[in-house]
Amino acid sequence: MAKLSQDDLLAQFEEMTLIELSEFVKAFEEKFDVTAAAAVAVAGPAAGGAPAEAEAEQDEFDVILTGAGEKKIQVIKVVRELTSLGLKEAKDLVDGTPKPVLEKVAKEAAEKAAESLKAAGASVEVK
């Protein structure tokens, strides 16, 4: 098997959907017995610090479709790209708003998905 360069790999990843990338990461973690969680530096409490202000930053987000707008067909296409849903399931999701499109995804992935849906004319919330 030919060895792929980093640029070749990145080009392949750019062509994948978020769902495909998520499945790839899971398979990679299982194959090599690693986790993709980022290392988090742990800091001690601040001297004279504010009590109970150590609420962790949210790391999982839901992308909620709140309305399809006037370009419903475009929104259905984007929903299908973001998920592994078929045409009927994607249409039902768009028709039944408000509904979650993606659940428990990273902030960056949620923002990208929201941008794609907004560009197609949908109204979206990221929670």
UniProtKB/Swiss-Prot annotation:
InterPro entries in UniProt: Ribosomal_bL12 (IPR000206), Ribosomal_bL12_C (IPR013823), Ribosomal_bL12_C/ClpS-like (IPR014719), Ribosomal_bL12_oligo (IPR008932), Ribosomal_bL12_oligo_N_sf (IPR036235)
Cytoplasm keyword on record: no
Keywords, in A-Z order: Ribonucleoprotein, Ribosomal protein
Gene Ontology MF, one: structural constituent of ribosome
Disulfide bonds: none
Entry function: Forms part of the ribosomal stalk which helps the ribosome interact with GTP-bound translation factors. Is thus essential for accurate translation.
NCBIfam families, per database record: L12 (TIGR00855)
Sequence similarity: Belongs to the bacterial ribosomal protein bL12 family.
HAMAP family per UniProt: Ribosomal_bL12
PANTHER family, sorted: 39S RIBOSOMAL PROTEIN L12, LARGE RIBOSOMAL SUBUNIT PROTEIN BL12M
Protein name stated in the entry: Large ribosomal subunit protein bL12
